[in-house]
Amino acid sequence: MIQLDHVIYGTSDLEAAADRFGTEFGLTALPEVGRHPGGTANRCIAVGGTQYIELLTPYGEGAIGHWVRRRIADGDGWLLWSVTTDALEFEAARLGLEITEGRVTHQDGTVGSWRSAGSTHREVTRGGLPFWVCYDDPDGTRPEIWGRRLAETDCGMPLQGMAWLEVGIARPELQRWLGSDAAIPVRAVNSARDGLLRVAVATPEREIVIS
């Protein structure tokens, strides 16, 4: 099954970005700062289920950190989006993608790991297409963990996941990438700017739209 997983917002200042999401949108970032070997650090905002918004900033040296630094040279903004699948090998083979491994070190010393495909593809790094991810979760505890994380945030309203994404990309290209059976709430639009444009988080009473 293919499902929307998370979206990535690039920032030069994690704390300032977390404050902005809290003040403007009522979305509370988790306090923990994760650090990645590729030269980035993050804070996450749980938005329902296992979905989340990742605030990502360059940290130290590393190829990914340098890429993020270039992308946000003109200001903070949306970078990437991802989908999760339990058939990563199949999707990677179908699209001719290499599978790579990733990990994050949490502040308590534990390490989270995953495998992904497509994160270096040109159309993905422009933000139009999603990269694929499959988490290492042998005990099946990931939904429970994200449930606790959501409970830790004080947003003042129930969050029900991402209602939709708006992406500047041609719909046939997106359909070819995801496959005809994928039911992902993505609006492909004609835009002067490629990539992720807007994200809507669902609540019982309204949608929180973030540009």
How should each PLM-predicted stretch be described?
Residues 12-72:
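Glycine/small-residue-rich interface belts in oligomeric ring/scaffold proteins
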Residues 25, 31, 51-53, 67-69, ...:
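Short, surface-exposed linear patches
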Residues 1-2, 25:
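General secondary-structure edge motif
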Residues 8, 56, 136:
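Anionic group-transfer/hydrolysis microenvironments
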Residues 15-28, 90-95, 170-181:
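Amphipathic alpha-helical segments
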Residues 3-12, 43-48, 53, 66-158, 182-211, ...:
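Vicinal oxygen chelate
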